[in-house]
Amino acid sequence: MPWIQLKINTSGNVAEQLGDAMIESGAVSVTFQDTHDTPVFEPLPGETRLWGDTDAIALYDAETDMNDVIAMLEQEPLLGVGFKHKIEQLEDKDWEREWMDNFHPMQFGKRLWICPSWRDIPDPTAVNVMLDPGLAFGTGTHPTTALCLQWLDGLDLEGKTIIDFGCGSGILAIAALKLGAARAIGIDIDPQAIQASRDNAQRNGVSERLELYLPKDQPADLSADVVVANILAGPLRELAPLISDLPKAGGHLGLSGVLATQADGVAEAYADKFTLDPVAEREEWCRITGQRRAS
């Protein structure tokens, strides 16, 4: 059915309060987006951050009297009488179908494809990972995930062990297994990521070769031929002593989730143990790779 959309510009520090008021006025959902499309990359630990200039967007049933809604919201001290707003009629669509139509098989490197389950596989002879887009974890569409997948495709993984540090959906570990790795270990702080990785590994027929751990449960003596960590620059710097010890001597390390402007700081944290390659960039993001030197 059609909907009515109400958009109100506000500041991040009162956005949630405004959202509550919109729900009380009859909205069936409220979302927030940055007015200027400025990304928030690294909130501080424990911080749920909204932008300084935020749009609160509410959806109402098509039968809603928006004059009544506006009159009710004008009673809110943070808005007041005559507050600026925008009302739009949204046409009825098959939103699920429209969402699905946006995702297509994607190729990374020479051999590797990531394919949504509802699409035909473009090349049955290629290395195909079946992975459906989700809300929280990597699917290959983000530049950092793409950089890591391309790197894995270019390695000789046959018979190797890989650690995916911050595994999310498990996409990198699963891709490595499909590319020939004998064993993969996924580590993530989020139990939902562990479950998502487990489900995706089962779908791709590699669950018997994938071990998954929360950090508190991981074995103390972990090591691997290849280690990939697609997280963020801050954790990569802070966890450098831990991550640096995971690759075996001569093993490969791949780091991403790093803005190009942050590359030097992250690389410096790993330079004492690794011979680093030139930084690879995609859009505003980069990938740092290297090989561990013998102790």
UniProtKB/Swiss-Prot annotation:
Intracellular or extracellular location(s): Cytoplasm
Organism in which the protein naturally occurs: Pectobacterium carotovorum subsp. carotovorum (strain PC1)
Gene Ontology cellular component annotations, sorted alphabetically: cytosol
One GO molecular-function entry: protein-lysine N-methyltransferase activity
Disulphide-bridged cysteine pairs: none
EC number in record: 2.1.1.-
UniProt cross-references to HAMAP family, sorted A to Z: Methyltr_PrmA
Family: Belongs to the methyltransferase superfamily. PrmA family.
Described purpose of this protein according to its UniProt entry: Methylates ribosomal protein L11.
Primary localization: cytoplasm
Coiled coil: none
Classification via NCBIfam families: prmA
Entry binding sites for S-adenosyl-L-methionine: 145, 166, 188, 230
Gene3D superfamilies the UniProt entry points to: Vaccinia Virus protein VP39
Protein name: Ribosomal protein L11 methyltransferase
GO BP term, example: methylation
Keywords per UniProt: Cytoplasm, Methyltransferase, S-adenosyl-L-methionine, Transferase
Signal peptide start and end residues: none
Catalytic activity: L-lysyl-[protein] + 3 S-adenosyl-L-methionine = N(6),N(6),N(6)-trimethyl-L-lysyl-[protein] + 3 S-adenosyl-L-homocysteine + 3 H(+)
